């Protein structure tokens, strides 16, 4: 059965399907929208008591429901200056060192950090010898993405690609999955060096949004697009630890890359398949003064 599911991933018209689902998810269809939301809540056992608006009828579109806000304080933020926090609700797929520009995906599968970053060689060099973490957001999860540490945006890259599903099954079976799918790469400058937040698209993921650019929708094609941003002055975009930086419409995966020596150790319990909750401790940081 798994082989059949993987074969279907290669055969499906994934971009066409995603565009169709995107239009349906954005539609404001009244009772039909509410019925779809209620079905989704039941199917995926979503705890709506955490949502700022707990009633399905409050959402005019499925996208509005899927990108719902949480109640204030429902995800307490670890404010320890030596702690990096989880950026999302989800589950750790893999994490570990970046060795010779290679990132571990699953048993028997690695992919290139250079390819992941859209063949931006100078960017890839900045993360050599550092660490990575891949976090999968399931349909039931809260789908806003937050900053694990304070950072100032320096660059965004849109990389066109496939739209394979990014669930654990495809991660185990599709080579180079996260470096093949459509993605948005945001690079931030932090006290501990560069941080890359890679938002990976997937089948039926209608769109990827960032708080500074809105929905990232370059023209259809195979061209990589880059935007550079000032890191100083009134136009600099600085986001605090825990602040929202983006969101998925219909969910996917976040891959984070960290500079060499930025992380001392991952926090207790942070390992492959561990459940993550935004705001909780993710990693212990090297002391900034020592790093300098």
From Swiss-Prot:
Modification Pyruvic acid (Ser) occurs at: 252
Q: Which residues are the active-site ones?
A: 89 (charge relay system), 146 (charge relay system), 252 (charge relay system), 252 (schiff-base intermediate with substrate)
Q: Which species expresses this protein natively?
A: Shewanella baltica (strain OS155 / ATCC BAA-1091)
The superkingdom listed in its UniProt entry is Bacteria
Q: In which pathway does it act?
A: Phospholipid metabolism; phosphatidylethanolamine biosynthesis; phosphatidylethanolamine from CDP-diacylglycerol: step 2/2
One Pfam family in the UniProt entry? PS_Dcarbxylase
User: Assembly state and interactors?
Assistant: Heterodimer of a large membrane-associated beta subunit and a small pyruvoyl-containing alpha subunit.
Q: Which reaction does it catalyse?
A: a 1,2-diacyl-sn-glycero-3-phospho-L-serine + H(+) = a 1,2-diacyl-sn-glycero-3-phosphoethanolamine + CO2
Q: What does this protein do?
A: Catalyzes the formation of phosphatidylethanolamine (PtdEtn) from phosphatidylserine (PtdSer).
Describe how the cofactor binds.
Binds 1 pyruvoyl group covalently per subunit.
Q: Which GO terms describe its biological process?
A: phosphatidylethanolamine biosynthetic process
The cellular location(s) given in this protein's UniProt record come to: Cell membrane
Q: Which Enzyme Commission number(s) are on file for it?
A: 4.1.1.65
Q: Which family does it belong to?
A: Belongs to the phosphatidylserine decarboxylase family. PSD-B subfamily. Prokaryotic type I sub-subfamily.
Lipid biosynthesis keyword on record: yes
Query: Which cofactors must be present for this protein to function?
Result: pyruvate
Which Cys pairs are S-S linked?
none
InterPro entries assigned: PS_Dcarbxylase, PSD-B, PSD_type1_pro
Post-translational modification as stated in the protein's UniProt record: Is synthesized initially as an inactive proenzyme. Formation of the active enzyme involves a self-maturation process in which the active site pyruvoyl group is generated from an internal serine residue via an autocatalytic post-translational modification. Two non-identical subunits are generated from the proenzyme in this reaction, and the pyruvate is formed at the N-terminus of the alpha chain, which is derived from the carboxyl end of the proenzyme.
UniProt protein name: Phosphatidylserine decarboxylase proenzyme
Instruction: Please indicate if the UniProt record lists Membrane as a keyword.
Output: yes
Record's keyword terms, sorted: Cell membrane, Decarboxylase, Lipid biosynthesis, Lipid metabolism, Lyase, Membrane, Phospholipid biosynthesis, Phospholipid metabolism, Pyruvate, Zymogen
Enzyme class, spelled out = lyase
A GO molecular function annotation here is: phosphatidylserine decarboxylase activity
Topology relative to the lipid bilayer, per the entry, is: Peripheral membrane protein
